[in-house]
Amino acid sequence: MGIKGLNSIIQQQVPSAIRPREMKQFFGRRVAIDASMSLYQFLIAVRQADGVQLASADGETTSHLMGMFYRTLRMVDHGLKPCYVFDGKPPVLKAHELDKRTERRKETEQKLAELTEQAEIMKHERRLVKVEQWHVAEAKKLLGLMGIPYVDAPGEAEAQCAELAKKGKVFAAASEDMDTLCYRTPYLLRHLTFSEARKEPIHEIDTELVLQGLGLSQEQLVDLGIMLGCDYCESIKGVGPVTALKLIKEHGSLENIVEFISSGGNAKWKVPENWPYKEARALFLQPDVLDAEGVSLKWEEPKEEELIAFMCKEKGFNEDRIKSGIQKLRKGLKGGVQGRLDSFFKVKPKTTEQLAASARKAQAAKKTNQKGKVLKRR
């Protein structure tokens, strides 16, 4: 689900933190991609002309394989070095969100049985799409044969992507979920795995610019995300995005906000009973991840014969197209070795204290500018 309204806040308050990019601008960059999110996109978007998912001769869905093969090939062809990160065990706090998703699926299934118009049927069928374990297993097999590295995260994939980016193993984390920013990735790439047909630019979000522009520390950004609504707990009823940002700036932390509301700050706002915001905060600030220093990412020569056997003989893809793709893959992986000049210099991420100081400085500058405007009017 991500975090409701965070992208809108950044667009309105700090538009300069979101840069539209073309894929070629990431030549030589290593990028950690949220695999589960990508597979979900492929299962939704990669379809035949009649809207039905691609399938092999025995009727098994192959949309996830086509999406994974060709979108990865496109990235490599542009000089990117993609690696995929798969979800591990979800945190206990996420159980309520997963239960809600299951309930929504049941409601959709019931409604689907009552529909008669084909367009409505197709729309609701897409809402039932779910990434199964066999989709994941086949995607891993495909990546292994392509020579593309992947990481099995112990917990949330976005958190592991952010960990790899923080430690300099990759340039950025790629996901559609805005909660990736709360795990402190230096950069978040959105729309990276979208199809070319959608003509959506890649959005590169600079986390440090977001913090400076909003005048928040990393901890306060996490508290804002929890207030807006995340996968780990409910939000405060009656508090929208604008109010949430205002409260964080005025009171500094969720502890102070809860105290303010509980003491009668606003009768319309209601803090959920036994609200586990502290536990949710800990999941963002101390997530369950593999230490990036111990993770090895290697891009290897594709295994052509095994790849053709799997994709063509077993799954029914066109052999000439797969062979052509393998040649592009081989060429792209060799070309990516050239790399970028700035990849030879490891950028040391700022400490929590440095980020907090930057946020205070930005906030002070903003207040000074506002005072200057008032004096000019006088």
Curated annotation (Swiss-Prot):
UniProt cross-references to PROSITE patterns, sorted A to Z: XPG_1, XPG_2
Region (N-domain): 1-105
Biased composition (Basic residues): 368-378
Residue sites binding Mg(2+) 2 per the record: 177, 179, 231
Ranges of compositional bias, category Low complexity: 356-367
Cellular component GO terms, alphabetical: cytoplasm; cytosol; mitochondrion; nucleolus; nucleoplasm; nucleus
Keywords, comma-separated and alphabetical: DNA damage, DNA repair, DNA replication, Endonuclease, Exonuclease, Hydrolase, Magnesium, Metal-binding, Mitochondrion, Nuclease, Nucleus, Phosphoprotein
Necessary cofactors: Mg(2+)
Magnesium found in the keyword field: yes
Region named Disordered: 356-378
Region (I-domain): 120-251
Start and end residues of each stretch annotated as Interaction with PCNA: 337-345
EC number, as in UniProt: 3.1.-.-
Protein's job: Structure-specific nuclease with 5'-flap endonuclease and 5'-3' exonuclease activities involved in DNA replication and repair. During DNA replication, cleaves the 5'-overhanging flap structure that is generated by displacement synthesis when DNA polymerase encounters the 5'-end of a downstream Okazaki fragment. It enters the flap from the 5'-end and then tracks to cleave the flap base, leaving a nick for ligation. Also involved in the long patch base excision repair (LP-BER) pathway, by cleaving within the apurinic/apyrimidinic (AP) site-terminated flap.
Subunit structure: Interacts with PCNA. Three molecules of FEN1 bind to one PCNA trimer with each molecule binding to one PCNA monomer. PCNA stimulates the nuclease activity without altering cleavage specificity.
Family: Belongs to the XPG/RAD2 endonuclease family. FEN1 subfamily.
HAMAP family linked: Fen
Name of this protein: Flap endonuclease 1
Organism: Eremothecium gossypii (strain ATCC 10895 / CBS 109.51 / FGSC 9923 / NRRL Y-1056) (Yeast)
